[in-house]
Amino acid sequence: MIDTTLPLTDIHRHLDGNIRPQTILELGRQYNISLPAQSLETLIPHVQVIANEPDLVSFLTKLDWGVKVLASLDACRRVAFENIEDAARNGLHYVELRFSPGYMAMAHQLPVAGVVEAVIDGVREGCRTFGVQAKLIGIMSRTFGEAACQQELEAFLAHRDQITALDLAGDELGFPGSLFLSHFNRARDAGWHITVHAGEAAGPESIWQAIRELGAERIGHGVKAIEDRALMDFLAEQQIGIESCLTSNIQTSTVAELAAHPLKTFLEHGIRASINTDDPGVQGVDIIHEYTVAAPAAGLSREQIRQAQINGLEMAFLSAEEKRALREKVAAK
């Protein structure tokens, strides 16, 4: 179902949601951190979703063990490097990795700006080693409040040329976008793109707010757009992309089953929507699974899957020249 003549992208992928279980085990031993299990087989149920979680917040707790072992900046650098290696193994040509440095720093009080620098270094080295093209999206974790998000923003601004976009993720219901208007004003002033997690736990009004008040050019998940025909029309007309994450939306109980996922409807409506993983390490999936298993189960035709693959590059935070070069590079292989 993947068209090998086209670039394969993953533009909604959390670096801190893709820490390998084996790496969690090894870092736990290296830094003498107590883990809930001592073998890979017994650790996996604690760090991967085995059965669907009742809600988004429950799902997010599965990510916690991955960041609890980030006891040094070297550990952060390692997981960033491994993220690129995983992308290469999946056959991805281009990946946008998003990460929350405050979340990664929290367990061991690491310097937030230092985490940003370590991630930049690890990703850069991974791209050099594996030949994958990558850009970084900075996440503000709304769950930890406005002040913590301000600290993350300052850390990103200290490395503004290595950050492509700003995102807001976490507890959408408890911490609405209206709390972060000044943060996004500064992000736009820095020349960054804007993508926002919206319409995942909250309704279509959260998507409207992300677009109108925060300046979102893309929406992460956005499943609740299906409830508002005017919003769907607006997304299609303005070419505001939806970063769909099929398996993730089932595992968080945002959508009951793949057959009920709105991605097919979005594509039929002319909305620029793409297929992405979200937190592949926690979900136990990869981009190949999303294209070959999840997308057909969500009712997408072969042509719709191909369109979603095209959309992934069209939506990417790349210049027209960068997109053209990537298309030509893949076509020449």
Swiss-Prot record:
GO biological process: adenosine catabolic process; hypoxanthine salvage; inosine biosynthetic process; nucleotide metabolic process; purine ribonucleoside monophosphate biosynthetic process
Record keywords: Hydrolase, Metal-binding, Nucleotide metabolism, Zinc
Cofactor: Zn(2+)
CDD domains in the record: ADA
Top EC class for this record: hydrolase
Residues annotated as catalytic: 200 (proton donor)
PROSITE patterns the record matches: A_DEAMINASE (PS00485)
A Pfam family the protein falls into: A_deaminase
UniProt-listed Enzyme Commission number(s): 3.5.4.4
Protein residues bound to Zn(2+): 12, 14, 197, 278
SUPFAM superfamilies for this protein: Metallo-dependent hydrolases
Reactions catalysed, as given in the entry: adenosine + H2O + H(+) = inosine + NH4(+); 2'-deoxyadenosine + H2O + H(+) = 2'-deoxyinosine + NH4(+)
GO terms for MF: 2'-deoxyadenosine deaminase activity; adenosine deaminase activity; zinc ion binding
Family, similarity comment: Belongs to the metallo-dependent hydrolases superfamily. Adenosine and AMP deaminases family. Adenosine deaminase subfamily.
UniProt name for this protein: Adenosine deaminase
Species this chain originates from: Shigella sonnei (strain Ss046)
